[in-house]
A protein has these predicted regions:
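Short helix-boundary/capping micro-motifs
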Residues: 11-28
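Residues within the DNA-recognition helix of helix-turn-helix
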Residues: 28-31, 35-38, 108
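A short LG(V/I)-centered, amphipathic sequence patch enriched
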Residues: 40-57
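Central regulatory/effector-binding core of bacterial HTH transcription factors
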Residues: 89-152, 315
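Secondary-structure junction motif
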Residues: 182-209, 273-277, 290-298
């Protein structure tokens, strides 16, 4: 029985699938399956099985989950302690929802790194809503920026609001929409495919069927397609302010628009939180951070966005 095997089991149990666990760890699905299989053989128990409603824990798996979670946390703390003893730089690992990752994370981390007193290794990546609390609780991320996820899975994390925003529907400046909203062509970014995100909730309330949605690899690409007259898109209002002023996009009135949203910082509870995570949380309350969130193009132009990949060490 190894730390790798226990880590794989905890993530499969928490996230509900081998696919989600592999994505969170940045490894292949066969690697997770092999680790889980080895643990099953060692313990003589199936631990978790696939049912009609997702993964189901066996009685043995249910008892193992709490203990395995503690061991995974202790392993992460041991790794951090050795790094500190070796004089290695502090690590900061941030995951974020797709829209935050596309526009906000890079300029925030760039500004925070410049302010940080000592050397800092900062990395960032994308996570869907159901992964965020699990990644933080299992020490695979220090901070997650996106929806409020603290109450979802009973994990020792807190979600604190950092920025309120408005969701609007936009189309090309000369576009004309006809008929009910659920019959329009919707051009959306990755957030719309996440049922736990504010954008996912917004689209679901309008009952937009899957066949009426075209999903683009970035929000910028979806807005560009809408500006070209291909359909309508959902946007965080302050992020498209320039396109609205230039007339490239225009607001479309739909029921429930504008919608209200909020980005939260999800972290471990205060007594368990790392010093660098606490420092980032304080920075997120500063006027400098608020300005970067309101006008992120001052940091990294959206046209240069490349979807980041979150990678963890599999050992």
């Amino acid at each position: 029985m190894t730390l790798t095997q226990l880590n794989a089991f905890v993530l499969v149990a928490r996230l509900g699938s081998v696919t989600a666990a592999a994505s969170a760890l940045g490894v292949s699905e066969p690697a997770v399956s092999q680790a889980l299989s080895a643990l099953r053989v060692h313990l003589g128990d199936q631990l978790v099985s696939r049912g009609p409603n997702g993964m189901t824990l066996t009685p043995g798996g249910s008892r193992l989950l709490a203990t395995a979670s503690q061991i995974v946390v202790l392993g992460a703390e041991a790794h951090a302690a050795v790094r500190a003893a070796q004089g290695a730089p502090d690590q900061l690992r941030v995951v974020a929802s797709p829209t935050v990752a596309e526009f906000v994370t890079a300029p925030l981390l760039e500004a925070f790194t410049k302010r940080y007193a000592t050397g800092l290794e900062a990395s960032s990546g994308v996570a869907v809503t159901k992964e965020m609390a699990v990644l933080v609780a299992n020490r695979l991320a220090d901070v997650a920026i996106g929806p409020d996820v603290a109450a979802d899975q009973g994990l020792p994390v807190v979600s604190e609001p950092i920025f309120k925003y408005r969701l609007v529907v936009v189309a090309g400046g000369q576009s004309h929409t006809r008929g009910p909203a659920h019959q329009w062509r919707w051009l959306v970014g990755p957030s719309a495919t996440d049922p736990g995100s504010d954008v996912g909730h917004f689209v679901a309330r309008l009952r937009v069927p899957e066949e009426r949605m075209s999903v683009f690899p970035s929000q910028t690409a979806a807005w560009a397609a809408a500006a070209d007259g291909g359909g309508v898109s959902v946007a965080v209002e302050h992020l498209v302010a320039q396109q609205l002023r230039r007339g490239e996009l225009s607001l479309v009135d739909v029921p429930g628009s504008p919608g209200q949203g909020c980005w939260y910082a999800t972290m471990l509870e205060r007594q368990q939180r790392s010093a660098v995570a606490s420092s980032l949380r304080r920075f997120l309350s500063t006027p400098e951070a608020m300005q970067l969130i309101r006008s992120p193009s001052a940091g990294v132009p959206p046209s240069k966005f490349r979807l980041p990949v979150y990678v963890t060490i599999w050992s």
